[in-house]
Amino acid sequence: MKDHECETYQTMQHPQRPYGLLGKTLKHSFSPQLHAAIGAALGTSYPYILFEKQPEELASFLRGDSWAGLNVTIPYKEAVIPYCDALSDEASEIGAVNTIVRDGERLIGHNTDYAGFRALLRENGVAVRGANCLVLGSGGASKTVQCVLRDLGAAKVTVVSRSGDVNYTNASQQQDAEILVNTTPIGMYPNNGQAPLYPGSFTRLQWAVDVIYNPLRTNLLCQANKAGMETVGGLGMLIGQGIAAAELFLGRAIPQTIGAKIEKDMLLEKENIVLIGMPGVGKTTVGMEIAERMGREFYDIDQMTVYDDGREIPQIFAEEGEAYFRQLEQKIVLSLANVTGAVIACGGGVVTREENYYALAENGRLIFLNRDLTMLPTDGRPISQAVPLARLYRMRLPLYRSWCDAELTITGMQPDEAARHIIDML
C-alpha cells in the first residue's frame, strides 16, 4: 500500500482526530509509513497524516482542535514553543520541540529527537566520549544533537552556522574534528546531490552522521564513505524518535526491539539494488530477474540512453565518440537519483564518471557482478571491442570495487541463481 493510500485508509477507518507531522514542506517524509508500521507491530493502528502549513497558518492550526497529537519538523521546532502550555525537561533544556500531545486543554511539548539521536549513535557504535565533534547547522535539530553529544561526554562540540564565528567558509580549519554531524536540510529530497561542505578536508574525521533520512545516504555521507570514513544516515533516528512519540500519543510503553525490524523493512523497501560490472556480465538479465521476483520497477541505463538518443550504442560511439555517450549516460543516471525501491542495471562504463557514484549511492546498494572474462560477450559493445578485454578489466576493477557495497562472482550461475544470491544478501 502506498503512503498516501495508507493515510487515506487510516483516516477513513478512524473518524477521531488524527495524529500527524507538522512542517512546511513534507514531500520527503516517511513518517506516515513509520507510524503505520509501529501500529502494525503493536497489533493496532492510528490515523497519521501530513500537515503542511505556512508560517502564517501556524497559530490558528495549533490553537485548533483538528489533530490529536503532532510531530514537528523543519522549520517549526522552535516556532511551536510559545503555543505550548508546558515543556518536558528535554524540550526545555534543548529549546526545541518535535512532539506535541494534548493534556485536556493544555498542549505539552516534548523532544523525542533526543532519544532518537542517542539511540542512533549507540546502535551504530559511534564513540562520543572524549571526541571532538563538529555540528553543521544551528536550528532546532542542531540543539538536540549538541545536547546529546555533551551528555555523552564529547570533549568539544563546535557548531558551524552560516553567519557564526565558525561558518562554512572557515569550517575546514577545525582539523581536530573526529565526528561530524549534519543537522541542516542541505542534501534532503528533492534536492539530492548537495552537501554543506566536503568531509574529506578534515584529516582526523572518523565518523560522518547525517540526521537526514531521505535520501538514505546524503551526498555528504557518500563523500565521506569515499574518503574512508564510517557513515550513519538518519533513518534510525527517525524510527527511534517515532517510537518515543508513539508512546506519548498512545499512552503505553513500546518495546524498543520493534525499531530494528521496522528499520530493516523500510530499508529493504526504499533502497535500490544497483548492479555494476563489466560489459556483458549479465547485469540486465539478472536485474530483470530480481525485479520480477521482488515486484520492483526495473531501469536499464543503457536501454534508457538508447531510447533517449534514438541510436544504438555502437552507432553513438562511431558517430559521436565515447565522451558524448558518457554525457548522455550521466544525464540518465542523474534522472534516477530520486528513485527508490527499484532495480537499476548500469552500463559497464558508468564508473568512469565519479558524479554517477553519488547519484546511484544515495538511495542504492551497489553490487558488483564479476565473471570469468572468457565468458563475456563483446558483440555490440564498442569499448570491449576497442580495448582488449583483459586490459579494460584491469582498468575498471579498482573502480568497481571502490564503488560497490558487495561483490558477487557469478561465473557458472544462471540468472535466477544469481538473483537469488543477491536477494539473500539484502
Task: Describe each PLM feature range.
Residues 362-399, 406:
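A glycine- and Lys/Arg-enriched "phosphate-lid" helix/loop adjacent to the NTP-binding pocket
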